[in-house]
From Swiss-Prot:
A Pfam family of this chain: Cys_knot
Annotated GO MF terms: follicle-stimulating hormone activity
Name used for this protein in its record: Follitropin subunit beta
Family note: Belongs to the glycoprotein hormones subunit beta family.
Tree of life domain: Eukaryota
PANTHER family: FOLLITROPIN SUBUNIT BETA, GLYCOPROTEIN HORMONE BETA CHAIN
Entry-linked Gene3D superfamilies: Cystine-knot cytokines
Described function: Together with the alpha chain CGA constitutes follitropin, the follicle-stimulating hormone, and provides its biological specificity to the hormone heterodimer. Binds FSHR, a G protein-coupled receptor, on target cells to activate downstream signaling pathways. Follitropin is involved in follicle development and spermatogenesis in reproductive organs.
Assembly: Heterodimer. The active follitropin is a heterodimer composed of an alpha chain/CGA shared with other hormones and a unique beta chain/FSHB shown here.
Length: 129
């Protein structure tokens, strides 16, 4: 019985104390207006859960900052979008996460909305792989 209680407490501790915010492979759609179509590329980004809470009593002296799984460090990679006009810039630079953590969402560099456009959004009807 004690081992069962220990196992239960260990699982609770693991769920509360250990975040599962980690690097994951995703496919994003990139587009250039000058090229009139989208391409899909594979990249790395952060995904997972972070410990957070929403207080019932809102204390103005203590700001309520919700933590989200976001990048700690990233690099930029560039891909050439095929089929662009000769006068157009066919290079597209996109971020690749190299390290993740649970922290405040930085709206200067990240879409912090509840429902953004999503990684597969394309404003053109033609999509190339």
């Amino acid at each position: 019985m004690k081992s069962l209680q220990f196992c239960f407490l260990f699982c609770c501790w693991k769920a509360i104390c250990c975040n599962s915010c980690e690097l994951t492979n995703i496919t994003i759609t990139v587009e250039k207006e000058e090229c009139n179509f989208c391409i899909s590329i594979n990249t790395t980004w952060c995904a997972g859960y972070c410990y957070t809470r929403d207080l019932v009593y809102k204390d103005p002296a203590r700001p309520n900052i919700q933590k989200t799984c976001t990048f700690k460090e990233l690099v930029y990679e560039t891909v050439k979008v095929p089929g662009c006009a000769h006068h157009a810039d066919s290079l597209y630079t996109y971020p690749v996460a190299t390290e993740c953590h649970c922290g405040k969402c930085d709206s200067d560099s990240t879409d912090c909305t509840v429902r953004g456009l999503g990684p597969s959004y394309c404003s053109f009807s033609e999509m190339k792989e």
